[in-house]
């Protein structure tokens, strides 16, 4: 499904929170949305890989990577796990790598930057907890919508029709 965050803001400005502009699109889908699952980790993507093993239909994985630009939390192999399990997208408050491969995938991916250095895979971090960045608090189960213009958050799914 295609989402236009500008139109959604016009229709639901009193309902949505707008995330501060900081993300760039790295995936093959320019717009995506769904109910969020959260992971909080720092320079370690083991829990991300584990979370993406679950059925992701209608869901977006929101990763609070502490804003680190030193290690990429998402690479082509982790993103492929998301595709294989039907995730709508991944939003990373951190970095990605393998950007040429990421843009070929049928997956929305937004992140702060790219860097060639990979993350540790020890599984250090937390899952399904509230996280805060970009001026917004994200709760598991909230609904997020992203496109090339921006990222917005709603406590309930928005009527797109």
Curated annotation (Swiss-Prot):
<dbReference type="InterPro" id="IPR005493">
    <property type="entry name" value="RraA/RraA-like"/>
</dbReference>
<comment type="subunit">
    <text>Homotrimer. Binds to both RNA-binding sites in the C-terminal region of Rne and to RhlB.</text>
</comment>
<dbReference type="GO" id="GO:0019899">
    <property type="term" value="F:enzyme binding"/>
</dbReference>
<protein>
    <recommendedName>
        <fullName>Regulator of ribonuclease activity A</fullName>
    </recommendedName>
</protein>
<dbReference type="Pfam" id="PF03737">
    <property type="entry name" value="RraA-like"/>
</dbReference>
<dbReference type="InterPro" id="IPR014339">
    <property type="entry name" value="RraA_gpbac"/>
</dbReference>
<dbReference type="InterPro" id="IPR036704">
    <property type="entry name" value="RraA/RraA-like_sf"/>
</dbReference>
<comment type="function">
    <text>Globally modulates RNA abundance by binding to RNase E (Rne) and regulating its endonucleolytic activity. Can modulate Rne action in a substrate-dependent manner by altering the composition of the degradosome. Modulates RNA-binding and helicase activities of the degradosome.</text>
</comment>
<comment type="similarity">
    <text>Belongs to the RraA family.</text>
</comment>
<dbReference type="GO" id="GO:0005737">
    <property type="term" value="C:cytoplasm"/>
</dbReference>
<dbReference type="GO" id="GO:0051252">
    <property type="term" value="P:regulation of RNA metabolic process"/>
</dbReference>
<keyword id="KW-0963">Cytoplasm</keyword>
<dbReference type="InterPro" id="IPR010203">
    <property type="entry name" value="RraA"/>
</dbReference>
<dbReference type="GO" id="GO:0060698">
    <property type="term" value="F:endoribonuclease inhibitor activity"/>
</dbReference>
